[in-house]
Amino acid sequence: MDGRGPYGLACQNCAKGKVKCIAMPDGDGCQRCHRLKKPCHPSHGVRKRESQHFQSPLIEEMDAKLDSVLSLLQSVYLQPSSPNGQAQQYKRKASTPELSSPTQPARTSVSESTYILPPGPLTSPDIVDAEGALNRFREEVLRFCPFLYLPPGLTARQLQQERPFLFETILSVMTRSVQEKMNWSKRIKSTIAHSMVMENESNIDLLLGLLVYACWSQDHYLKRMPTLTRIVELAVSVVMDLNLNKPPPPDAHRLTELGGGNDPNWTRKGPKIRTAEEKRAVLGCFFVSSIISSYFYQMDAMRWTLQMEEDLGSLAASPEWPGDAALAVHVRLQLLAENARKLRDEHGTKPVHIPFFLKSFRFELEAIRNSIPPDLQKDDTILSQLHYVELSIHETAFTANVIPHSINTNNPIGPDAVDCMWHSLLAIKSWDTIYRRMPPDDHTRWSIIQWIHLSRAVVTLYRLSTHPAPDWNRDAVYKTLNIVDVFTHIRASFDQLVPNPGGPFPNDFWAHGWLLGRAIATWLHAPGRLHPPNTDEPTAWAQTSSSHNGEQVLPTWNPPAPALQPQPIQESLQFTNPAWMDGLGLPPGDPTGGMHQAAGLHPTGQMHF
């Protein structure tokens, strides 16, 4: 008779009767079979239970969708590139990435990749040649915000290996196709989300790529919302994680400061030697965050520190390329504008004392102007920033913006405010002189910095041209700088950016910018918007003018009946408000549709100049 098996193996008779099977003390069968005098045979195995499936319809539907997505990704990555230049397949690898050939598919392995991003239909000839895109960015674009140095000998393959995310962002900003910009936007943001949220990465590659994307992606226009503030805030967070803005404090009390655990060779690390690349990146992050925060008002600028002051001094003293000296001047000027904003904010809702406020900042601005290196004193990007900061200081001291129903527009603003507004007008006029001598093609290379310069200049000029204060001479504003002429020149500059005039409307980003310019011009020329003054009669303001530092200053004004009507103050140019663009006939979320009618285009989509 066989012995008992392991737990759960009853003999055949006990198993059939579904009773407890207890072995005999001598191991010869079980007690039940011995009592019933039956042969005791062990069973041969455990009866397998039938598995129960509780698959909900929702899970089955999700599994089906996941299978379709995986099959789509596999089909995209396994298909060869087209002969006319299919975009390279870019991937983020745990090992060193490699630039794929335009005529061969990228060698991609799921096992060796940290994550893979599916490429969009990026077939524009402007970016298929990565070397050409890199050279154009280095030679034509980077000078408008020089927080990055790309040596002349640096190739696209080397840049992709050393700075893969920066490489992708450069390619993304160098295309003019609206659809490709949107495709790149999804890829870049997917990379940002995975790297910073899922993988908790912080490195110089991410920081530089974020700054490039913030400066040149035009994402705020494509998405019709101020998304750049979040991108810049992410860049600031990378700076904080890397301690680029300041070293760890000496009283740091994290648990890791106690020692290296079981490692006998652990020693506390000393201060890290900062590279020039890191110094440029942190200074560029401050520059971009400060000027974007002053435009969108949805974030605070990066705080200035002593470490950044040292970086600024060392970069200006030992520049590796001309952009280092230019970056130092840009940062100095923007720091002055930021300090003016901080001083204004400290007063809260109370108005600042205009003469005292302007005295110190004008002195500092003049000191920076005199310290500009000789080879940069005629640089248009530097001069544009100089006049922008001058305008910012005077607008901070006293703004020409009038909020409807909040103040009595019949009250005079006083000579100090008039003087401040007049200097704002002179700063805009100086900026306009610089702008008019820039070639129209520079618009395609501008960073967000230059676009903010233009926006503040035209918005403030509009407010000065329609300010209702009785002691402010709108006739003199119109004679000094005609806002209609300014917009006419802007529109003429954009006209030269449109490819194939008179043909079908192209999928070109700057063609849409041309449409926006025409829409604004149409809005400005609407009946009742602006009324030119009578320029034949001499103004009382011109008779009481005085001189200040060689410039004409008009401190007081006793006007006749105003010739320039201020009715549209409540409709002031609100470039930061998406609803304002919708009012021009631009539907939200679509940078193409709806603009034709607002710009005066033919319904067939033909461009008529």
UniProtKB/Swiss-Prot annotation:
One of its GO terms (molecular function) is zinc ion binding. Its main location: nucleus. Residues 82-118 are annotated as: Disordered. One of its GO terms (biological process) is regulation of DNA-templated transcription. It comes from the Eukaryota. InterPro entries: prtT, Zn2-C6_fun-type_DNA-bd_sf, Zn2Cys6_DnaBD. Residues 11-40 bind DNA. GO terms for cellular component: nucleus. Residues 97-114 have a biased composition (Polar residues). SUPFAM superfamilies: Zn2/Cys6 DNA-binding domain. It is found in: Nucleus. Keywords: DNA-binding, Metal-binding, Nucleus, Transcription, Transcription regulation, Zinc. Transcription factors AN6788 and AN6790 act in tandem to regulate the expression of the non-reducing polyketide synthase pkfA from the aspernidine A biosynthesis cluster. They do not control the expression of the other genes involved in aspernidine A biosynthesis, nor do they regulate the expression of the highly reducing polyketide synthase AN6791 and the esterase AN6793 with which they are predicted to form a secondary metabolite biosynthesis cluster. This is Transcription factor AN6788.
